[in-house]
C-alpha cells in the first residue's frame, strides 16, 4: 500500500502512455497508396507512358525550331543594325566623293586655264625678248674677211700710250668681253622683271580663287622695281594645295571653314537683331510723337473753341472784387488776367503812397 499523502497524483492514467503508441501502422514503412496513378505529392506516376512517341518527337522538334527562330531573329537584328550603319557610312562617303569630284574638276579646269595663260605669256615673253634684242643689237653686216691679215689698217687703232709692261692682251678683245658681260647682265635683269610681271598678272587674274597655290616668284633677288611689285597675299592653311592631302587635313580645313562661316553668320544675325531693335524703337517713338502732336492739336482746338464762345463783357463771377484775381478764384483765366492788368499799379506809385503822410479829409 502506498503511504504517500497524495497517491493519485502520481498514479493517474492520464500521464501514462497508451498501449498502442508504438504499434501505429505504416509509421516506419512506405506502403503504396490506394490510387496507383499518383504518388504522395499528387503528381502522376509514369505520365509519359500515356503520351505517344510521335507527340514527344513533335514537341522536341517544335522546341528546337522555336529556339532556332529566336537565335535567327537576334542575328537578323544585328545584321540589320550593321547594314544601317554601313548605309550611313556609304552616304557620307558618297557625299564626300561627289564633293571631291567637283573639286578635282574645278582644279583641272584651273590647271588647263593656267597652262593656256602660261603658254600665252611665254609667247609674249619670247616676242618681247626678240624685239628687245633687235632694238638693242641691230643687225650688222659681217665684214669681208681678207686672206692677208697684214692688209689691215692698224693706223685706226687707238693704242694707249702708257700701257702696263705686263699687259699683253688685245684691247679689242677685252672691250668685247666687257660689252658681252654687260649685255648678259642686262638681259638677265630684263628676263627677271618680265617673269615678275607675268607672275603678277597671273596672280591678279586668279587672286579671287582661294584654292590656287601661289606661283614662285624671284621677288627677293631683283632690283627695286621688282620690290615694288612684291604683292604677296596672306597665306592660309589650305591642305588642298598639297599633292596628296590626308583626310585629317581636309577635315580640319573644312571644320575651320565651317567655324569661320558660323562666326560670320552669328555676327550678321547680331547686326540684324540690333537693326530690328532700332527700327522698332524708332517706330514706337514716332507713334508716341504722333500721339503727343495729336493731343496738342486737340488741346489747341478746344481752347480756341472756348475763347470764341466765351463773352467776357456779359460774364459775371461770384467774386467781383478788385483784389480777387488769383488763379484759385472762381473767375476764368481770361477774366482773372484782365482784373490783374486793371488793378496792377506801378511800383513807384505804390512806394510813394506808402511813405506819404496822411491828410485829413475835412481840412
Swiss-Prot record:
InterPro entries: Spc42. It is found in: Nucleus; Cytoplasm, Cytoskeleton, Microtubule organizing center, Spindle pole body. Residues 160-184, 310-363 are annotated as: Disordered. Its main location: nucleus. Residues 62-136, 248-297 form a coiled coil. It holds the Pfam family Spc42p. Residues 170-182, 349-363 have a biased composition (Polar residues). Residues 319-329 have a biased composition (Low complexity). It comes from the Eukaryota. Belongs to the SPC42 family. This is Spindle pole body component SPC42. It comes from Saccharomyces cerevisiae (strain YJM789) (Baker's yeast). The lineage of its organism: Eukaryota, Fungi, Dikarya, Ascomycota, Saccharomycotina. The gene is SPC42.
